[in-house]
Amino acid sequence: MEKLQQLDLMDKILRELDDLKNSQTSVLKKLAQIEADNINLGVALLDDKLPDIHTEVDSSIEIMGTLVEEFQQHRDNFYTKNNLVAVQDPTA
């Protein structure tokens, strides 16, 4: 695989990771809404299980955020190491 193809694939993966993180954030918001609704409803099953799920999803978002940052750094290092600025913009 050529260097530019690798860079394009890394950029695609970064977009997908960011999309996944956004999806997880949406899940967390929905969980919070269910937890709030259950305050009025008072179902013990939900009281017992939802906080654990909330914690797991929140932890997953943090892990995903770290992964995105680390992979972005990997991508940037690859870009610099392979001098791809000269290939992408020959006037540079």
Residue ranges and their predicted role:
Residues G42-I63:
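Short, glycine/alanine-rich amphipathic alpha-helical segment
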Residues D8-K21:
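Short, charge/polar-rich alpha-helical segments
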Residues L14-L17, L28, M64, R75:
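Generic N-terminal initiation segments characterized by hydrophobic and/or small/turn-forming residues
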Residues Q24, E56-H74:
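Amphipathic alpha-helical coiled-coil segments
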Residues D18-N40, K49:
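Amphipathic alpha-helical interaction modules
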Residues N38-G42, L67-A92:
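Long amphipathic alpha-helical coiled-coil segments
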Residues Q5-Q6, Q24, Q33, Q72-Q73, ...:
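Residue-identity detector for glutamine
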Residues M1-L9:
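Short, charge-rich amphipathic alpha-helices with coiled-coil/heptad character
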